[in-house]
Structure formats: structure tokens, C-alpha cells
């Protein structure tokens, strides 16, 4: 009979588990905050109609960080091509 299973006698290695658990927790919270910020940006954008806003929110919600990146890339490209400044007149007083 073994005194303890193989691997459980290693004293310092649980620290790595706690480190990675904390790291993934912080990454998860950061991704969640980015998704919420993206959804707020979608809701504030005047250039999108209601159906487009709903579709973008669904894309961001179900695809997560990938959906947020896609939205960011496509919205920046569209705002440059249309000359949209998100409702702001730059240079006018």
C-alpha cells in the first residue's frame, strides 16, 4: 500500500494551480468588461438603426471577445468610409 498517491507529495505545486486560477479569473473579468463596454457603445451609436443594434448586440453577446473585436474593426472601417464622427462635429464651434 502506498503512503500517498503519486503527485500529492509535491508541496510547492498547488501554488501554480492557484496562480493560473487567479489569472483566468482576471482574464474572464476583463473580457466581460470589454463585452459590456462594447454593448454600451452599440447602444449609444446613432448611426445604427434599431435592428442593426439588436443584431450587433447578439453577435457580441454570443461570440464574446471575438464578436467585440469584429464590431470594433467593422465600426471603425465604416465610420472612416462614411465620415461619421459619432454625432460630433469636429472643428465647429
Swiss-Prot record:
Segments passing through the bilayer: 17-37, 54-74
Keywords: Cell membrane, Membrane, Transmembrane, Transmembrane helix
InterPro entries, A to Z: CLS_N (IPR027379)
Subcellular location: Cell membrane
Keyword Amino-acid biosynthesis: no
Membrane topology: Multi-pass membrane protein
A GO CC term assigned to this protein in UniProt: plasma membrane
Domain of life of the native organism: Archaea
Short name of one Pfam family: PLDc_N
Chief subcellular location: membrane
Protein name: Uncharacterized protein MJ0574
